[in-house]
């Protein structure tokens, strides 16, 4: 007998706030706890009924912040807690792990998603190798064994843009459209956002035009010596560092019946994949292709909604072109490019966006796709089905 698909009974997220903004004094558990409390209240489920919390996080520097979060949110001390770090993929991978716990019968009620307090991330230092030498600060850990395999993410995206022929103007047009969509749909997205520190909407989206975009500072080009800006990346075409959290409530059919919960969506399939670490942004498309096959779909165009966490404008352009998707089909309310990038939370936020759009546009047998690429050449994607009206 096939295992029943895990059900999704509730979801919520915080606003996304740029680093050193309104959330700058909050720890990751302090951003995430109100989100979890809200999604449980929306479902009508007691905090003591949660079997496990799975949280994606990239910057808290260990210590299993999911356990701290579970206790801070008032969940039972018996609640299991797992912290998962697959960088940008972590929020979606955490939900996949939660779904696997339910599908395997190890849990019946799981809260899963991601959270990041980039503003409070620890300063990283390598310990001195010898007595009397100094500790050495570093920005991030290595994602691949050699420097050639592990380029700076901005440089990697700029190289890909140049090699694939995506111009700065094309990238800026994509970014402007993302911000325009986000601003136009703030009222719609307010329903999924839990107010924290008085912030009720994503802070970063702004009104832009081509003239203003052209004045944005450059952050990466393929060859600084040649000063070739044709395919360069600017602050507009790269997702901003940010704080935020997003979680979903996963339940088994048994728990749904026992606790009289209303299932709003079904977790159909998930895929994780790796690709060349030199071009990590391509992993989202590869993961999407794999999960579509697992879910029994031959074409991404059959998805009613598609959410991509687009850390770079060139990534969004490449993803849509590679899968043959229409512009309006991908990130219809704006994506990570206009929201910001709270690394461990970003993919979970994209999932919440997808779930909200599926619920707000009910049609029979409707499916959606969410995808993300992560540092080191990782990709993660999932297919979700709505509950038919």
Can you name each region flagged by the protein language model?
Residues 268, 274-338:
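Active-site pocket-lining segment
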Residues 56-108, 147-152, 212-240, 321-352, ...:
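Conserved catalytic cysteine-centered active-site region
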Residues 123-162, 207-240, 389:
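Glycine-/small-residue-rich "gating" segment that lines the acyl/pantetheine channel
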Residues 24-89, 93-96, 101-102, 106-109, ...:
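Conserved beta-ketoacyl condensing-enzyme motif
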Residues 86-116, 161-189, 248-254, 320, ...:
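Active-site-proximal alpha-helical scaffold in enzymes
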Residues 13-37, 60, 82-96, 108, ...:
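Active-site pocket-shaping loop/turn-to-helix segments
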Residues 13-14, 25-26, 42, 170-258, ...:
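N-terminal extracellular/periplasmic Venus flytrap/periplasmic-binding protein-like
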Residues 37-49, 160-165, 256-263, 289-304, ...:
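Phosphate/pyrophosphate-binding loops at sites that engage ATP/ADP/AMP, CoA/4′-phosphopantetheine
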